Amino acid sequence: MKKSLIALALILCMLLCTCGANEVATAESTEAGSIKETTPDYSNALILADQGMFSSGGTVTDPVEGTYDSTTNWLDATRAGNTAHVDHANVLYQIPAGETGNPMVFLHGYGQSRMGWMTTPDGRDGWSNIFLKKGHGVFLVDQPRRGEAGSTVTMTEDGFLDAWAADSKDYKPGDQAWYTHFRIGRVAPERYKGSQFPEGEESQNQFFRQMTPNTGSLDMAVAAEAMNAVLQDVYEMTGKKSVFVTHSQGGAIGWNVDVKNMAAIVAIEPGGTPAVGSEQYQNLLAANIPIVIYFGDYIDNGPEDIMSTGFWKGIRDGAVAFAEQYNADGGDCIVVNLPDEGITGNSHFMFQELNNQQIADHIGAWMAERGLE
């Protein structure tokens, strides 16, 4: 019995010592942790004064034939008597604290949404963040029938759109076609020598998953009308005209947008330029809109056996001819061939590539020269 009591006493002593040691260790680690803790450095943090979303433009459809029955409502697949708000643009905006420059409105190209401006395939800052840090409010558009502006007239033409019907539109795969046509590499996943496109399987995965289809037919006039409303809404919000940044197919839309609320156009490899003497050309010239048009690499030095190489040469040659005449008529237009500036390795998606900050700085300098910084 005595031995048992002694053994029990020893066990209790050991437990108490262990607890004490743990408490001391915890205290020391807590104390050490508090010593190591420092106030986070927010000196370079991006601080927003405001952000939000809104829709601009669009129409309301005529009611579907028949009378709306509130008792069956959603279960009535004919949608009789229903209307739909359609063919608008959707805008996500962010305003930096201490905003100094003109607002910038970004319009994506074909198969993309505003996401392309907001990030990169490898997760770095996209141009929206970069230009926010330069003091510009950014307004990121999803054009009609794309992304978060997907509502379109096809929703009511047949009463109720059945996504599983036999006659539904098929999505056409295009990963490899995109990759080649937009000069990332000859065949995915290989990249051209010196490419600025982010390397690695996951970067390519993230890039391809940005692509999104139209929900209805592509209608340039509908898109341009919605963009007129966007620029008007931005002007009413900010009291300033916008620097209108377009890409690819968005560039083709951009030339048809009303110039009254534009401060300048930055076109990234636009899908063509206005014909000299056309109504679009004359409107831009009369409003004295400064224009800069950017082209990347692998155009002069792209594979000659790939049709897209000749395509991009033609697009760029057209832009150069446009700029020459625009300037001769008293306008201000510059075509920037990035390799001529010592900036190499860029594809059609230069705003997502490893040197996107450098190109944004180049645009920023052009804007500053025109009082738009």
Regions flagged by a language model, labelled:
Residues 33-99:
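N-terminal cap/lid segment of alpha/beta-hydrolase-fold proteins
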Residues 101-109:
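Short beta-strand element of the alpha/beta-hydrolase
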Residues 108-120, 271:
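Active-site glycine-rich loops that stabilize anionic/oxyanionic intermediates
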Residues 124-149:
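Conserved alpha/beta-hydrolase
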Residues 221-242:
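Conserved acidic catalytic loop of the alpha/beta-hydrolase fold
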Residues 245-254:
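Gly/Ala-rich beta-loop-alpha elbow adjacent to hydrolase catalytic centers
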Residues 267-338:
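The feature captures the conserved acid-bearing segment of alpha/beta-hydrolase catalytic domains
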Residues 345, 349-373:
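Catalytic active-site module of serine/aspartate enzymes centered on a nucleophile-bearing elbow/loop
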